[in-house]
């Protein structure tokens, strides 16, 4: 029998992680039908991640800052975590050939292997990241950083947001995105402007179950650099919400390193839930994950592909 794994991030009303919930605090609905949880874990689960960094022309002034922020993510990876580093502009490259836990190797790639400036083939890059993760076990994550909108390769077949969102949902790949938008008129001095949002969940029974919520707000800021792009692509919070990841939009480069570290912390604080589906009909099923408790919000993937046996 197949177990459908669902990883959930639970936040309190104060925006902090809620780490100590028990199995009976969660409810998972498959196409609206409540499922019995056959898997529950609230200990740290290892991750396999493809980190994709925008090397487009608009990012040139910030290349070194992004590199340092990505190195911060590597520094807080745990021994069982594995990663590959990708960059996208004139081409999309991902190194090394195999996933590794070797921090020194990942630092070397960040310091010497990233390409020079070019366009921003955003959805193509995510598609390459999904392909890299296909045969990996456990929790599969893409972390992408960009300051701009998708700018596909001219004269070539390119992926759309719809293409990669569908594929990420079918292949159970969680997408986290960090967008840099220093030109935001609502910035008010820096820090996060907003995170992506999700639909609200209703109550259930005594005490209520909090449903999907928005993405965390965060770090204070100030300063920043002149605008380098109109704004990050509006598809980023959509694919993050659909896959159970997170979207963080920054208004200053000051918060880059802290945000990369924040993503790593969140990934290490997720709950692992699982259930055995009633039928494997080869169709996409809607998922809804809720947690009991006042003011709690849950982020988890919103669908899964009920692949038939064989």
Language-model-detected regions and their locations in the chain:
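Scaffold/interface architecture of coatomer-like assemblies
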Residues: 1-310
């Amino acid at each position: 029998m197949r177990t459908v794994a669902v990883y959930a991030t639970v936040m309190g009303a104060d925006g902090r992680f809620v780490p100590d919930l028990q199995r009976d605090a969660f409810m998972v609905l498959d196409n609206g039908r409540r499922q019995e949880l056959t898997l529950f874990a609230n200990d740290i689960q290892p991750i396999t991640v493809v980190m994709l960094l925008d090397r487009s022309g608009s990012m040139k002034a910030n290349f070194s800052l992004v590199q340092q922020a990505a190195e911060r993510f590597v520094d807080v990876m745990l021994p069982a975590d594995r990663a590959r580093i990708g960059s996208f502009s004139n081409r999309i490259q991902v190194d090394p050939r195999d996933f590794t836990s070797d921090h020194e190797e990942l630092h070397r790639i960040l310091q010497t292997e990233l390409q020079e400036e070019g366009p921003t083939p955003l959805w193509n890059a995510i598609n390459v990241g999904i392909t890299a993760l296909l045969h990996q076990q456990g929790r599969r994550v893409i972390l992408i950083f960009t300051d701009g909108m998708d700018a596909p390769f001219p004269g070539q077949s390119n992926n759309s947001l719809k293409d990669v969102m569908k594929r990420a949902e079918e292949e159970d790949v969680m997408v986290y995105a960090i967008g840099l938008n220093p030109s935001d008129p609502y910035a008010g001095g820096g820090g996060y402007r907003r995170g992506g949002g999700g639909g609200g969940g209703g109550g259930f029974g005594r005490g209520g179950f909090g449903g999907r919520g928005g993405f965390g707000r965060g770090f204070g800021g100030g300063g920043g650099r002149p605008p380098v792009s109109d704004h990050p692509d509006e598809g980023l919070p959509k694919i993050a919400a659909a896959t159970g990841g997170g979207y963080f939009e920054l208004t200053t480069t000051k918060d880059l390193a802290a945000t990369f570290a924040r993503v790593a912390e969140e990934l290490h604080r997720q709950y692992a839930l699982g259930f055995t589906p009633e039928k494997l009909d080869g169709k996409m099923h809607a998922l809804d994950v809720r947690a009991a408790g006042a003011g709690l919000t849950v982020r988890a993937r919103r669908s899964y592909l009920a692949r038939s046996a064989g």
